[in-house]
Amino acid sequence: MTISTRKIEELFKNSISVKEDCIEKGFSSIVAMGVEITRSIESNGKIMLCGNGGSAADAQHLAAEMLIRLRPHNNREGIAAISLAQDTSTITACGNDFGYDVLYERVLRALGRSGDCLIGITTSGNSKNVILAMKAAKELNIKVFGFLGCGGGEALKYCDEAFIVPSDDTGRIQEAHITAGHALMEYVEDRLIESGYLNLL
């Protein structure tokens, strides 16, 4: 086995190990998020997601799967979701005029309504723009959920529920976040179909 092959194998093993640690911790937080998100959607609320870098990509990824579909055999109506990290004109305007730190807070205050949900994704738990959005969400009676790492960081203080990956390795945290995100989406999708809120097409 070459050195490069060993490094790839080690990466895969580390990724599996982090997910096994997540399994040991349990998934009560994901279930609790799923219950609240289902309740919000059934009350005509929406899900907002935000993050930076790879976590911004995760926010867009999960919002797209809510709006369109996650599983090919579930051709269903869309679930109201929006990534706050996808509009380059808004992102650059805010960064230029007011600063990047307030980006998600400003958008959330404009779009968010009582009864909505916010999912903030930050591997460090300390992304300032995500934390400011969480604070604003609390003021607006919006449920706040976190996909976090590194023990949760400051963001944990503002979360109604949080899924914390027990790692400080950014790549491994991101991999666990997207797995948890898919689990959460499947939970919500199943509940909304079972309740009759979502119709299969």
What is each model feature region?
Residues 147-159:
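Short, glycine/polar-rich helix-capping loops at beta-to-alpha or helix-loop-helix junctions
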Residues 56-60, 126-133, 155:
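Short glycine/serine/threonine-rich phosphate/pyrophosphate-binding segments
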Residues 85, 122, 148, 163-171:
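Short beta->alpha connector loops at strand-helix junctions that form conserved
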Residues 35, 39-111:
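Glycine-rich, small/polar surface segments that engage phosphate groups of diverse ligands
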Residues 1-25:
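Generic N-terminal amphipathic, Lys/Arg-enriched alpha-helix
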